[in-house]
Regions:
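Membrane-proximal intracellular helices of multi-pass ion channels
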Residues: 1-461
C-alpha cells in the first residue's frame, strides 16, 4: 500500500479495536448468559434476551427485557457485572489493566492505541493516564459501595448486602443503570436521602469525565499548598473543564427546575411527595437522564412535558472521557457557542477569550448530526414494527442511542424485531460518537489538504 493510500484510509487500528472488541465481548457475554447456570431457573434464557442483556451491559445502557434480579443466578449477575465494568472502562483500559497486573511491558503500538482511543494530544504519559483512570475508578466505586452498604447490609444480610452494594456502585458509576432491587428500579428509595445522594454522586462524577477530575484535584492541591489563590482557582482551569462544569451545572439545575415546574402537582410523579422530596426526586431525574438510567419515579408517570425535557437531557448526555453516553456536553456547548458567535458577527468561534479550533467545531456538528439521524431513523422503524405510541418509541430510542437506560415501560413489550433495533442502536450509541470523535480528531486524515479548490457561494434559508 502506497503512502497516499495510507493517508486516504479512514479507519484506524484504534477504531477497529473498539468496534470489534465491544462486539466480541457482547458475543462472549451472550454465550455465557445463555448457559443454564446463568439463569435463576437453571433452564437457560432465550438467546435474544441474553443478547439484549449482554449488549445493554457492555454498552452501559440499562434497558432490560427481563428482570435482572429474578431472571439471573448469582453467576449470571457476576457475568453482567463484569460486562458492565468492561463497558464502563473501555477495551483499552481493560487491556492496560491486564498488562499492569501481569507486569507486562506495554509496547509503543499499544501506547499509540491509547492515544487514539482517548484522543490524547501527545503520546507521552498515555499509560500513566490510564493508570490514574483505573485507580480513580476503583477508589470511587469502593467509596460508593461503602455508602450503599449502610442500607443494603441491614436489609439483605452481610454477604448479600455487600454484593448488592458492589453491584450497584459499579452499575451507577459506569452509568449502566442495571439494578437488583426489582422491576421498579430505585422507586422504593424515592424518599431515601442516602440512596439518592450516593447514586447521584456516582452518576455526576462519572459523567464529568476523568480529565475534569484530575484538573480539579490538582487545583485543590495547589490551593491547599498555597500555590494558587481562591481568585484564580477557576480562572486557571482549561477551556474544556470550564465548559464541562458550566454546562453540567446548567443542565442539572435547569432540568430539575423544569421537571419541578411541570410535575409539581402531577399525581403519580411529584404530586404525591413532600416539597423536599419533590426537589430531591426532580434533581435525581435530571441527573439520571444524562447518565445512568436508574429511576425513583416510573418514567410513564411523568407528564409529556417532563418526558420531552428528559429526552433532551438524555440526548445531550455526559462529558468526554466519562462513562456516560449521549452526544456529550462539550458538543452541545460548542454548537451553542458557534451559533452565538455567528449571531454576533464573529468570524471565529470564541468562548471566554479563547478561539475554538475549527476541527473541534466540525467534530461537534458531525457527531450531533450522526446521533440525531440515528435517533430519528430508529424511532420511525420502532414505531413501524412495534405499533406503540410515538412518544414511547422516541423515548426508548433516545435512551438507547444515548446509552441511558430509561424506558416508558416499553422494553419488555417489544417484539423480536423491536429488540433487535434497540440492540443495534445501543451498540451504535456506544461506538458511533467515540469512533467519530477519534476519526475527526486525527490530523492525518485530511485528504488532499494541499490542494486549493475554487470557492462558490450557495443559497441557504
Amino acid at each position: 500500500m502506497s503512502e497516499k493510500q495510507k493517508k486516504r484510509q479512514w479507519h484506524t487500528p484504534a477504531e477497529r479495536i473498539m468496534m470489534t472488541g465491544f462486539g466480541v465481548v457482547i458475543i462472549l457475554g451472550t454465550l455465557l448468559l445463555c448457559l443454564p447456570v446463568s439463569s435463576a431457573s437453571g433452564k437457560g434464557v432465550y438467546w435474544l434476551d441474553a443478547l439484549f442483556t449482554a449488549t445493554t451491559s457492555v454498552c452501559v445502557t440499562g434497558l432490560v427485557t427481563v428482570p435482572t434480579a429474578t431472571t439471573w443466578s448469582v453467576f449470571g449477575k457476576i457475568v453482567i457485572l463484569g460486562l458492565i465494568q468492561f463497558g464502563g472502562l473501555g477495551i483499552m483500559a481493560c487491556m492496560i489493566m491486564i498488562f499492569l497486573v501481569l507486569r507486562r511491558k506495554i509496547s509503543l503500538q499499544s501506547r499509540k492505541l491509547i492515544q487514539d482511543t482517548y484522543n490524547l494530544p501527545v503520546l507521552k504519559g498515555s499509560v500513566g493516564i490510564v493508570r490514574r483512570l483505573l485507580i480513580g475508578t476503583a477508589v470511587v466505586e469502593i467509596a460508593g459501595a461503602i455508602c450503599y452498604s449502610f442500607w443494603f447490609v441491614p436489609h439483605y444480610g452481610l454477604w448479600r448486602g455487600i454484593g448488592y452494594s458492589i453491584f450497584h456502585s459499579i452499575s451507577a458509576f459506569c452509568n449502566a443503570g442495571i439494578d437488583l432491587v426489582g422491576e421498579s428500579s430505585f422507586a422504593p428509595f424515592v424518599t431515601n436521602p442516602l440512596m439518592n445522594v450516593t447514586t447521584m454522586g456516582l452518576m455526576i462524577l462519572s459523567g464529568l469525565g476523568f480529565p475534569v477530575w484530575w484538573e480539579v484535584i490538582e487545583h485543590v492541591q495547589d490551593l491547599l499548598k498555597g500555590k494558587r489563590t481562591r481568585k484564580n482557582f477557576i480562572r486557571g482551569f482549561t477551556l474544556h473543564t470550564k465548559l464541562v462544569l458550566t454546562t453540567t451545572v446548567i443542565l442539572i439545575t435547569g432540568g430539575a427546575l423544569l421537571i419541578l415546574l411541570l410535575d409539581w402537582n402531577h399525581t403519580g410523579s411529584l404530586g404525591d411527595l413532600k416539597p423536599g422530596e419533590k426537589v430531591m426526586a426532580a434533581f435525581f431525574q435530571s441527573i439520571t437522564t444524562r447518565t445512568a438510567g436508574f429511576e425513583t419515579i416510573p418514567q410513564k408517570n411523568f407528564t409529556d412535558g417532563s418526558a420531552m425535557v428528559s429526552m433532551i437531557l438524555m440526548f445531550i448526555g455526559g462529558s468526554p472521557m466519562g462513562t456516560a453516553g449521549g452526544v456529550k456536553t462539550i458538543t452541545v456547548a460548542l454548537l451553542i457557542v458557534l451559533v452565538t458567535s455567528y449571531i454576533r458577527g464573529n468570524h471565529d468561534t470564541v468562548v471566554w477569550g479563547r478561539k475554538v479550533v475549527e476541527e473541534n467545531i466540525r467534530s461537534a456538528v458531525v457527531i450531533f448530526f450522526f446521533a440525531l439521524t440515528t435517533a430519528l431513523t430508529a424511532t420511525i422503524l420502532l414505531v413501524a414494527v412495534s405499533g406503540h405510541p410515538l412518544l414511547d418509541c422516541a423515548y426508548e430510542v433516545v435512551s438507547a442511542v444515548a446509552t441511558v437506560g430509561l424506558t416508558r415501560s416499553l422494553t419488555s413489550q417489544l417484539p423480536a424485531a423491536g429488540k433487535i433495533i434497540v440492540i443495534l442502536i445501543m451498540y451504535m450509541g456506544r461506538i458511533g460518537p467515540i469512533t467519530l470523535a477519534v476519526a475527526l480528531g486525527r490530523r492525518t486524515r485530511h485528504v488532499d489538504a494541499d490542494i486549493q479548490r475554487p470557492e462558490q457561494r450557495i443559497l441557504i434559508g
